[in-house]
């Protein structure tokens, strides 16, 4: 038995609520206990495991706890080097991935870069953009600044048991908050080409 405790009204906050509700139902169909809009107030070691006390007063008796409570860029070294840290807490870089010190470049989860949709500073904790940044950065360091990084719209895909969930762009919640008009499309299709085994 697995239980998921989430402070938000949905799991996978980067996806729109309509997609998250499909994930919620899939969790339940697999026997996962889902506790939304809940918070953990205490962990109590007991003889045969751990009691997880929730804000509502519910106590979950578990063998193991896995904490996944967000991501923050590790910018300690950048601060010590005197590099500029942006409003999101990431290392501020220009289009060539240079930091505030022109001889120091930065890439990956630790950088802040304008989101191509909103124009606002953002972080992208994804392997795809980090890989692209690394290639652009290496080219710029070796050959001079001629490759520009244009940002990431944060396309992400996750496997939830046998369900594939993906999203691209900003969520409806974020676009509403930023007052950016948008159109959305929700597609329930195959996760890979039909001629592959298991399609």
Indicate residue ranges for each PLM-predicted region.
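A Rossmann-like FAD-binding core segment of flavoenzymes
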Residues: 2-93
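A generic structural signal for alpha->beta connector loops
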Residues: 31, 88, 101, 179-181
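General small-molecule cofactor/ligand-binding pocket signal
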Residues: 33-35, 105, 183-185
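Residues at the C-termini of beta-strands that transition into short coil/loop
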Residues: 38, 95, 108, 186-188
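A short, glycine/Asx- and small/polar-enriched loop/turn
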Residues: 45-50, 101, 197-199
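FAD-site-proximal beta/loop scaffold in flavoenzymes
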Residues: 51, 59-139
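Mid-to-C-terminal Rossmann-like scaffold of FAD/NAD(P)H-dependent oxidoreductases
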Residues: 110-199
């Amino acid at each position: 038995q697995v239980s998921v405790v989430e402070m938000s009204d949905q799991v996978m906050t980067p996806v729109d609520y309509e997609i998250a509700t499909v994930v919620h139902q899939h969790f339940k169909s697999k026997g996962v206990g889902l506790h939304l809009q809940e918070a953990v107030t205490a962990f109590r070691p007991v003889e045969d495991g751990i009691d997880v006390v929730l804000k509502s007063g519910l106590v979950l008796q578990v063998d193991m706890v896995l904490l996944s409570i967000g991501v923050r860029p590790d910018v300690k070294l950048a601060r010590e080097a005197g590099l500029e840290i942006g409003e999101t807490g990431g290392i501020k870089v220009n289009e060539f991935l240079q930091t505030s010190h022109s001889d120091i470049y930065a890439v990956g989860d630790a950088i802040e870069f304008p989101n191509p949709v909103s124009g606002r500073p953002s972080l992208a904790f994804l392997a795809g953009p980090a890989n692209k940044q690394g290639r652009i950065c290496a080219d710029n360091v070796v050959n001079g600044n001629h490759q520009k990084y244009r940002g990431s719209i944060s396309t992400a895909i996750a496997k939830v048991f046998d369900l594939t969930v993906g999203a691209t762009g900003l969520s409806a919640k974020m676009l509403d908050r930023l007052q950016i008009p948008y159109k959305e499309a929700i597609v329930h299709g195959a996760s890979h080409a039909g001629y592959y085994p298991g399609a």
